Amino acid sequence: MSLKERFTSYAYLIRLDKPIGTLLLLWPTLWALWLASSGTPSLQMLMIFIAGTFLMRSAGCAINDYADRDFDRHVQRTKHRPVTSGKISGKEAVVVAGVLALIAFLLIQPLNIFTKELSVLALLVAFIYPFTKRFLAIPQAVLGIAFGFGIPMAYAAVLDFIPLEAWVLFVGNIFWAIAYDTAYAMVDRDDDLRLGLRTSAITFGSYEVLAIAFSYGVLFVSQLWVAHLASLSNYFLIGWGAALGCAIYQLKLVSSRKREDCFLAFRHNNWLGGFLFLGIVLGLSIQ
């Protein structure tokens, strides 16, 4: 394998070609940073968390491909991934994940000890998540915890404690992950059933669209609660309303249960997260 081919394989391993995962991890982190800092996060803090988000998502992808290497080759959508196709060994994937996680940990050294302690828990959850598809009925809940760990970490970094609004934001994010990753799991449901894997799309069965709607409901109610706790102005509702429109559109898509519609609904969550961030920015900056 040439150097160019090896670089390309590593790029695919950490999903450089698919930034949606990084964005779904980044939006909740930005929500928390803006709320914790009352709308004025320091540039250093912002850069640390943005870079850390990219590194940890990349590490998570590498460990996910290692964990799923014996399953991915049997799924049409994933059979060409670098590890399962043999372009990268399982050992290499683990090393890549470890190196990226180490860089992320070194990156947060300027932050307080509380944030560093939380980062260890975040790493453990991120590395455990891929294996939960073997035994948990709704592994998407663990994904929500992993993708939401930037929330308590951001509050800890800025305030050195975690207030109630952070936990409300965190719980809402878990349900958001259940919503968008259930749509994602609907794409591979037939393959996952054949392989004996467990996902929320399988667990919810014919009620999966209702479960997605309920999860979105929890997200949007939690956002309103956070807005109240953080004393955001009514301008927050501009972003909140736009995000709600996104959710309604996504529910319409997944209701068809077509693979391409479910995948589009999943990807469309980037806009939902961005609109909620816009609402927080407006609610903090315009009183």
Swiss-Prot record:
InterPro entries: HB_polyprenyltransferase-like (IPR006370), Prenyltransferase (IPR039653), UbiA_prenyltransferase (IPR000537), UbiA_prenylTrfase_CS (IPR030470), UbiA_sf (IPR044878). It is found in: Cell inner membrane. Gene3D superfamilies: UbiA prenyltransferase. GO terms for biological process: ubiquinone biosynthetic process. Its cofactor is Mg(2+). The keyword Protein biosynthesis does not apply. Keywords: Cell inner membrane, Cell membrane, Magnesium, Membrane, Transferase, Transmembrane, Transmembrane helix, Ubiquinone biosynthesis. The chain crosses the membrane at residues 19-39, 43-63, 94-114, 118-138, 142-162, 167-187, 209-229, 235-255, 263-283. Belongs to the UbiA prenyltransferase family. This is 4-hydroxybenzoate octaprenyltransferase. It comes from Polynucleobacter asymbioticus (strain DSM 18221 / CIP 109841 / QLW-P1DMWA-1). The gene is ubiA.
